[in-house]
A protein has these predicted regions:
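Low-complexity, highly charged intrinsically disordered N-terminal segments
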Residues: 67-151
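Short, charge-rich amphipathic segments
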Residues: 38-62, 113-125, 160-166, 183
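Generic detector of ordered, mature protein regions
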Residues: 65, 72, 83, 130, ...
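Charged, low-complexity, helix/coiled-coil-prone segments
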Residues: 24, 50-69, 123-137, 173-183, ...
Length: 205
């Protein structure tokens, strides 16, 4: 009896947490009107929200099954179903955390520098399009840069399944810049942009 009471309390807590991370927007990450020139595009937020909504649908599906079956299922089965819901909540937390970290820096003093990095990356893609206009299949979301600890810049390519996101694919390229390398003209940054170009051109090895 006490175990069932505990499980019911656990399920109520899961339900309360389940929809807290289903959407992200400019205001929620602290981007003010004066920050908009440096902010990621609405399409970047749209892609992020599509990913969050997809995860949320899976959370709601598993949660609905749990709520409908827990009272008549074995303790072992209920614990397993709770774990499956918690895994999806963790997936939402990780995805939301990545988007919040990347987007939220556009409301800080690093925003102009990060926007400059973005502009350089876009120029690299533009140069390819000018030479071969049909080489990319339709529009592509540009790379978005953010600051993080590390020794050198690094990239997370479009569509790559990330351990950080429990295997969720990356919806757009993300380039990490170390805190002490906020100089957009550094050549090593172009190296990371080139990795993304290789991937988007289908020649990544």
């Amino acid at each position: 009896m006490e175990t069932r009471v505990f499980l019911k309390t656990k399920i109520v807590a899961l339900k309360a947490r389940a929809r807290r991370l289903a959407q992200i927007d400019y205001a929620s990450v602290g981007i003010r009107p004066q920050d908009l020139p440096y902010a990621p595009s609405p399409n970047h937020f749209r892609a992020a929200n599509q990913r969050l909504r997809k995860i949320d649908r899976e959370i709601q599906r598993r949660l609905a099954h749990l709520q409908a079956s827990w009272s008549n299922s074995s303790i072992h089965r209920v614990l397993l179903d709770i774990a499956l819901v918690e895994r999806e909540v963790d997936r939402a937390r990780r995805a939301f955390g990545l988007f919040f970290e990347v987007f939220g820096q556009r409301g800080t003093t690093f925003a102009p520098v990060l926007a400059a990095y973005d502009a350089i990356a876009v120029d690299c893609y533009t140069a390819i399009r000018q030479v071969a206009p049909q080489i990319f299949r339709g529009p592509l979301l540009k790379p978005v840069c953010y600051m993080e600890h590390g020794f050198s810049p690094a990239t997370m390519r479009r569509g790559v399944q990330l351990n950080r996101l429990l295997g969720e694919p990356n919806p757009f390229p993300v380039i990490r810049i170390p805190w002490d390398r906020d100089n957009p003209w550094q050549a090593v940054f172009l190296h990371e942009v080139a990795h993304n170009l290789q991937a988007d051109l289908g020649i990544w090895q």
